[in-house]
From Swiss-Prot:
Transmembrane regions listed in the UniProt entry: 20-40, 59-79
Membrane topology: Multi-pass membrane protein
Protein name listed in UniProt: Putative transmembrane protein ORF159
Positions occupied by motif Cell attachment site: 106-108
Keyword Transmembrane helix: yes
Lineage: Viruses, Adnaviria, Zilligvirae, Taleaviricota, Tokiviricetes
Chief site of localization: host cell
Keyword annotations: Host membrane, Membrane, Transmembrane, Transmembrane helix
GO cellular component: host cell membrane; membrane
Length: 159
């Protein structure tokens, strides 16, 4: 029995977490309609990440932390602005939570890192629900899916 020329055996090549996070965040940015602002916030998050990490050779940790900062800044600036919250309040909260999540990745002992975990979850849920309330139909569904998906990587980090 011959196999067709177009046949290719399935290869198990999972997506890298960073690429998956970036895809989800770009989708979220597109839904919010603030892609330039999100990319700008990503640059800020990357700068903060590199500043906080002592071992710059740990590329994976820096990459993951950059993605975390990306999510936090997108939530802080984009979703809070969409829901009508003061931008300065959202940015301050974002910076505080970003520092807490970076502490988790650096392995700092509690209570510094653990303190921010419930705040971070509540912050993201508040932003997602506020954004969903301001949308309708398919956009609300996509927003709900995207926000829920962006929370999944943190369940293993926080626990």
């Amino acid at each position: 029995m011959t196999t067709p020329l177009c046949y290719s055996s399935p290869v198990n090549t999972p997506l890298s977490p960073s690429l998956l996070l970036l895809s989800l965040l770009l989708l979220l940015s597109t839904i919010c309609g603030v892609l330039p602002l999100s990319l700008f916030c990503c640059g800020i998050g990357t700068g903060i990440t590199l500043f906080n990490f002592d071992d710059t050779s740990d590329i994976i940790a820096v990459d993951i932390a950059s993605a975390i900062c990306f999510i936090i800044f997108c939530n802080g600036f984009c979703c809070c602005c969409c829901s009508g919250d003061p931008p300065y309040a959202s940015s301050t909260t974002s910076l505080a939570i970003c520092d807490g999540m970076l502490s988790l990745l650096r392995g700092d002992p509690p209570p510094v890192a653990v303190t921010y975990a419930p705040i971070f979850i509540a912050f993201c849920m508040h932003n997602s629900m506020s954004l969903i309330e301001s949308k309708s139909g398919l956009t609300a569904f996509l927003t709900r899916v995207t926000m829920t998906s962006s929370m999944l990587p943190f369940s293993s980090i926080i626990s």
